[in-house]
Regions:
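Metal-dependent nuclease catalytic regions and adjoining charged, substrate-binding loops involved
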Residues: 101-103, 113, 117-174
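Beta-strand residues in well-ordered beta-sheet regions across diverse protein folds
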Residues: 83-84, 126
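Metal-dependent nuclease catalytic cores that hydrolyze phosphodiester bonds in DNA/RNA
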Residues: 1-80, 86-105
Length: 174
């Protein structure tokens, strides 16, 4: 899931062990409830897909791209799908297609890697709004995907350095 994150952020997650330990310790009870709620809603999406008569297969299938292992959410009617629960703000990005311009969690890159491993050109997100229960489908065409192998090579190259990669943003706030 790190494939969509900036190289600098990934570099620090591997090279700053004190920060990693601190982040792990900062999860609270409510954080774990939010994670659980997200997993439950994603299971509801799978259930609803099956109940509506769709064929859901290859759930949590292990995939390998450029020696990196991942697990896809599944296939719905032979289309690669990632099930997501989202806040109303994030849900709107999937519904309107703005996710292709503003993807802070790297969802497109992750789905691109799964698509590359499956050798498919089309995929999509089935997303539920955690607040309203609204559901949308956001198709992802291969022209919107990244080359996952090249991206992994870029990450590896940056991790080999003892110096963090350059910032992908201005050091001076706007």
């Amino acid at each position: 899931s790190m494939i969509g994150q900036p190289n600098r952020k990934i570099w620090y997650s591997f090279n700053n062990k004190d920060d990693n330990k601190k982040q792990e310790e900062e999860f609270t009870g409510p954080d774990f409830i939010k994670f659980l709620y997200g997993h439950i809603l994603e299971s509801v999406l799978v259930f609803l897909s099956k109940t509506a008569g769709h064929k859901v297969s290859d759930r949590q299938k292990e995939l390998v791209v450029n020696d990196v292992v991942g697990h896809q959410d599944g296939m719905v009617d032979d289309v690669l799908v990632d099930f997501k629960s989202a806040s109303s703000f994030s849900f709107k990005k999937f519904k309107t297609g703005k996710i292709f311009q503003d993807d802070p969690f790297g969802y497109i890159a992750q789905l691109s890697a799964y698509a590359q491993a499956n050798e498919v050109k089309e995929a999509g997100f089935v997303v539920i709004d955690k607040t309203t229960g609204e559901i949308t489908y956001c198709p992802v065409h291969h022209m919107e995907m990244i080359n996952a192998e090249d991206r992994i090579d870029s990450i590896r190259e940056s991790l080999e350095s003892s110096i963090p990669p350059e910032r992908c943003y201005s050091a001076i706030p706007d």
